[in-house]
UniProtKB/Swiss-Prot annotation:
<feature type="region of interest" description="Interaction with PCNA">
    <location>
        <begin position="330"/>
        <end position="338"/>
    </location>
</feature>
<dbReference type="InterPro" id="IPR029060">
    <property type="entry name" value="PIN-like_dom_sf"/>
</dbReference>
<keyword id="KW-0269">Exonuclease</keyword>
<dbReference type="InterPro" id="IPR019973">
    <property type="entry name" value="Flap_endonuc_arc"/>
</dbReference>
<keyword id="KW-0227">DNA damage</keyword>
<dbReference type="InterPro" id="IPR036279">
    <property type="entry name" value="5-3_exonuclease_C_sf"/>
</dbReference>
<keyword id="KW-0540">Nuclease</keyword>
<dbReference type="InterPro" id="IPR006084">
    <property type="entry name" value="XPG/Rad2"/>
</dbReference>
<dbReference type="GO" id="GO:0043137">
    <property type="term" value="P:DNA replication, removal of RNA primer"/>
</dbReference>
<dbReference type="GO" id="GO:0006281">
    <property type="term" value="P:DNA repair"/>
</dbReference>
<feature type="binding site">
    <location>
        <position position="236"/>
    </location>
    <ligand>
        <name>Mg(2+) 2</name>
    </ligand>
</feature>
<keyword id="KW-0255">Endonuclease</keyword>
<dbReference type="InterPro" id="IPR008918">
    <property type="entry name" value="HhH2"/>
</dbReference>
<keyword id="KW-0460">Magnesium</keyword>
<feature type="binding site">
    <location>
        <position position="152"/>
    </location>
    <ligand>
        <name>Mg(2+) 1</name>
    </ligand>
</feature>
<feature type="binding site">
    <location>
        <position position="173"/>
    </location>
    <ligand>
        <name>Mg(2+) 2</name>
    </ligand>
</feature>
<dbReference type="GO" id="GO:0000287">
    <property type="term" value="F:magnesium ion binding"/>
</dbReference>
């Protein structure tokens, strides 16, 4: 998903403790998709309530977000609006990949291949309107604000860092850097020992922070030139140029200065080039208000335990931590006022 700039970027290992006191914008669709993929039962299936409704996203939002709050990190979830029209081909390709994985899953089920069943199941996820609406309901009950983007969520989330209202964007996607995010936090909600898809092996995944200005300075380029590099390698809005990865694209842009010179000299065709550059430089965004409210503890129990069969003892244990954190934060605000 998105642009792959990993090979040319400086990344620093970080932790929740390192980011204590921060307000962060969360690329909601990106993170919810991660929850749906990773929070699953032993059979590889997503968590479900007694009515068969998927609840992996609710588990992720409640427990992982509570962990952020416990570390004095305040999240503002940002939800996607209408996709940019040039994203249609990417969405179509993702749909085809899911269809192929569904066919492979059916074959794995027929042959009782448990390893393949678990691996393929984790790749077949859909963020439905119900999943989005229930995510927003839970955030409201937790007293957490969310922002509705007019288009791409990572663009809105990145804009919020440019305004100085949040410290970083929580997302797996490097696209945020093209949209101007000052900092992105990767592996911030799902970390630790993680299983490698399709195998029994695990790797240790650590949170990392990527600073835009540090990387631009290190690479000796501007943000617009970083966008050029992204376009050459491929984004959600264009397929990229065959044979050009991030390192080659960087070399070309540093040699020829801009993408127009590159495509002319190399005889490359890129459709909708000006429109893509403009969208990354000046994406649409909505006005917003960031206001944190007192959690509705009874409402959370009714919603998670009453409606979705969460363990009441585990939910209450987490709510006690949220309550302590809220009271501590509220008292700190009063102390600053007086």
């Amino acid at each position: 998903m998105g642009v792959n700039l990993s090979s040319i970027l400086i990344k620093h290992e970080t932790s929740l403790k390192d980011n204590s006191g921060s307000i962060v914008s969360v690329d909601a669709y990106n993170i919810i998709y991660q929850f749906l993929s990773s929070i699953r039962g032993d059979d590889g299936e997503p968590l479900k309530d007694s009515n068969g409704n998927i609840t992996s996203h609710l588990s992720g939002i409640f427990y992982r977000t509570s962990n952020l709050l416990e570390n004095n990190i305040k999240p503002v979830y940002v939800f996607d609006g209408k996709p940019f029209h040039l994203k249609s081909e990417t969405l179509r390709e993702r749909s085809l990949i899911k269809e192929k994985n569904i066919m492979k899953l059916e074959e794995a089920i027929a042959s009782n291949d448990d390893a393949k069943i678990r691996s393929l199941s984790s790749r077949i996820n859909y963020i439905t309107d119900d999943i989005v609406n229930e995510s927003k309901t839970l955030l409201n009950l937790m007293g957490l604000p969310y922002v509705q983007a007019p288009s791409e969520g990572e663009a809105q989330a990145s804009y919020m860092t440019l305004k100085g209202d949040v410290n970083a964007v929580v997302s797996q996607d490097y696209d945020c850097l093209l949209f101007g995010a000052k900092r992105i936090l990767r592996n911030f909600t799902v970390y630790g020992r993680r299983r490698i898809a399709g195998t029994s092996r695990t790797i240790n995944v650590n949170p990392e922070i990527i600073d835009l200005n540090e990387n631009l300075s290190n690479l000796g380029i501007s943000r617009e030139q970083l966008i050029y590099i992204g376009i050459l390698t491929g984004t959600d809005f264009n397929p990229g140029v065959k044979g050009i990865g991030a390192k080659t694209a960087l070399s070309l842009i540093k040699k020829y200065n801009d993408i127009y010179s590159v495509i002319k000299i190399k005889n490359i065709g890129i459709d909708n080039l000006d429109e893509i550059i403009e969208f990354f430089m000046n994406p649409p965004h909505n006005d917003y208000e960031i206001k944190f409210n007192e959690p509705d503890f009874d409402g959370i129990i009714d919603f998670l335990c009453g409606k979705h069969n969460f363990s009441e003892s585990r939910v209450n244990e987490t709510l006690e931590k949220i309550s302590r954190n809220y009271k501590k934060d509220h008292q700190s605000s009063l102390d600053r006022f007086f």
